[in-house]
Regions:
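Start-of-helix register in tetratricopeptide repeats
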Residues: 17, 51, 85, 119, ...
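Canonical positions in the second alpha-helix
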Residues: 8, 41-42, 75-76, 109-110, ...
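Short coil turns that delineate tetratricopeptide repeat
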Residues: 13, 47, 81, 115, ...
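Register position in tetratricopeptide repeats
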Residues: 28-29, 62-63, 96-97, 130-131, ...
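Amphipathic alpha-helical repeat scaffolds of TPR domains
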Residues: 214-236
């Protein structure tokens, strides 16, 4: 088959399909340089073929050549506006190279093409935190909490963001709202414990932890983690951990 494809290229060197197939042969024969060259020629011969472009981009990505992979995927975004996969690959690549602003830019492009989603908003929230851009992180999680007002996860995260940025009373109000809606919601209960700890209210902090440990709705793994934290806290303050 290899000889047949080689003969076809002798007759018509610009045959994109033939170049693509022979590129795969070169890769199989562990001749990556020749395979890469044939792949690039296949893309040049038929730039509108999605799979030729995808194979070349994936080759660069697997080889660890992020810049080259990004270049191909960015070109694919322009050539194939209805395909979301190139944008998703770019999110991953920009993440790996720690180019967080480009991650956000790419997520915005995903939103423009596919609409707003929880996953995109949460990823943007994480990126803003990684960039120490607390104001934008606030905005992103606030919008998400407004869009999903009955999802206790986002309200609790919003409360945590408030608390970590000096807005303790706003955080307290949110945690109380969550626990009124869902009394046994462990993340909000833990956040309340953290709130009391930050305020220096040790008795309320301890009482909150006790309520978590005694709550049947809280998973055993969460309780075990709390026990570990209590033991560590006890040891650090020279108390007898056996009392716990």
């Amino acid at each position: 088959a290899f000889e047949m494809y080689s003969h076809c290229l002798d007759i018509y060197p610009q045959g994109a399909a033939t170049l693509y197939e022979i590129a795969k042969f070169y890769m199989f024969l562990n001749q990556p340089d020749k395979g890469e060259r044939a792949l690039k020629e296949a893309v040049a011969a038929d730039p509108n073929n999605y799979w030729y472009n995808q194979t070349l981009a994936a080759y660069y990505q697997n080889k660890g050549e992020a810049a080259k992979a990004i270049y191909v995927y960015e070109d694919m975004v322009s050539h194939f506006p209805k395909r979301l996969e190139p944008l998703m690959s770019l999110v991953d690549l920009y993440n790996r190279t720690k180019d967080y602003q480009q991650v956000i830019n790419t997520l915005n492009r995903l939103e423009e093409r596919d609409g707003k989603s929880e996953a995109i908003s949460m990823e943007k929230f994480r990126m803003y935190l990684a960039m120490d851009n607390d104001e934008q992180a606030f905005t992103e999680i606030e919008n998400l909490a407004k869009e999903y007002p009955y999802d206790m996860r986002y309200l609790t995260i919003l409360g945590d963001v408030y608390m970590n940025n000096g807005k303790e009373e706003e955080a307290y109000s949110i945690f109380q709202k969550v626990l009124k809606e869902e009394p046994g919601y462990a993340p909000a209960m833990l956040s309340m414990a953290t709130y009391y700890e930050k305020k220096g209210e040790d008795s309320l902090y301890q009482a909150q932890l006790d309520s978590i440990l005694l709550n049947d709705r809280v998973e055993s793994n969460t309780k075990m983690n709390i026990m570990r934290q209590l033991i560590l806290r006890s040891e650090q303050t020279d108390k007898d951990s056996i009392k716990i």
